[in-house]
A protein has these predicted regions:
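Metal-dependent nucleotidyltransferase catalytic core
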Residues: 26-45, 53-64, 72-131
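Short, Lys/Arg-enriched N-terminal segments with co-localized hydrophobic residues
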Residues: 13-26
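Short hydrophobic alpha-helical segments enriched in small aliphatic residues
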Residues: 7-12
Length: 322
């Protein structure tokens, strides 16, 4: 039986204290949780191996009390686990949970429960486990798809050797010129939808366009700036949550100013801030990577926004742009 030491390189260096959470229950420590996870695996012959991924195996992720335990049990039969009512209670008393594969199955979406099944659980002591049971054949392939995977237990040496966990798969990727041009074009083009939405005072539509369609282009552009400055050796995290590590405080504050409340004029302010920021950084990225930025397109997009911003509510036509 193989059990890889994981204390030193998975969760060392944590200085925070455990806290009292829901219902006054004391939050179990990392040591207690890891022991529980491995004890359950060692005492169940159906579980042949355990591996972990996510923030706890990422050396660059911040360490705090909200980190999930992203655990995979490699099992002889997944069905035996998801048909056993209350099995998940071995890990503690759940506050509430989600079962992604069960939900997909209920909604008629294609899923293969014989390969993988999961429970995402927040327990009453505040700990969260994202646990999946994977079949042996599925696990052998799955573990190779994420360089953050780290083997905690392998009773039969069935899993492939995994090097030291790294977040390299999530590093900012160097763009080519087509990536850059398409990202820029979609940013400026989709802003015309925001302009007419603001003129019509369709706030839900505007918010959706800004945050679901346009903002990702700005985040991508900022990630390229960060990539250039770090030789594309870092990750900015999901939704750019780690950008503040790499951007100057002034630039990061300007990015935060692109968020707005629901008031129309405040939304316009955030849009123009977003445009100025995108235009500035796009020119910088283009210069650094030897690309050509379509400034004519950007200027035209800005002109359209400014005209619509100044357009009266009773206007019967859009002024000529000639």
């Amino acid at each position: 039986m193989y059990s890889k030491p994981f204390v030193n390189n998975v969760h060392s260096g944590l200085a925070f204290k455990q806290v009292l959470l829901i219902g006054g229950t004391i939050m179990r420590t990392q040591t207690e949780m890891y022991k529980l996870i491995l004890d359950i695996a060692n005492n169940d012959d159906r579980i042949r191996a355990v591996y972990m991924n996510g923030s706890r195996t990422n050396p660059n992720a911040p360490k705090d009390i909200f980190q999930d335990y992203d655990i995979v049990y490699v099992v002889t039969d997944t069905k035996a686990f998801y048909e056993e009512n209350g099995w998940i209670n071995k890990f503690g008393e759940p506050l509430y949970m989600q079962k992604p594969e069960m939900m997909d199955n209920l909604l008629g979406e294609e899923c293969h429960l014989e390969d993988t099944y999961g429970w995402l659980v927040i327990f009453k002591d505040g700990n969260r486990i994202d646990l999946h049971v994977n079949s042996i054949p599925y696990a052998k392939k799955d573990i190779l798809n994420d360089k953050l995977c780290q083997i905690l237990l392998d009773k039969d040496h069935i899993l492939p050797h995994m090097p030291e966990s790294t977040d390299i798969d999530y590093h900012v990727k160097r763009p080519n010129e087509n990536d850059f041009l398409c990202e820029s074009n979609d940013f400026w083009w989709c802003l015309n939808n925001v302009a007419k939405g603001l003129w019509r005072e369709e706030v839900p539509y505007v918010m959706d366009m800004l945050n679901s369609v346009i903002r990702p282009h700005l985040v991508t552009l900022l990630s390229w700036k960060i990539g250039i400055e770090t030789d594309f050796s870092c990750s900015i995290g999901k939704s750019g949550k780690y950008m503040n590590r790499y951007l100057s405080q002034g630039l990061y504050n300007r990015y935060l100013e692109t968020y707005s409340d629901y008031k129309i004029e405040n939304l316009w302010d955030s849009v123009f801030t977003m445009c100025d920021l995108f235009n500035e950084v796009a020119n910088e990225v283009a210069t650094s990577l030897g690309f050509t930025y379509n400034q004519i397109e950007a200027d035209a997009g800005m002109k359209f926004l400014q005209v619509v911003h100044n357009l009266s509510k009773d206007a019967l036509e859009i002024p000529s742009f000639i």
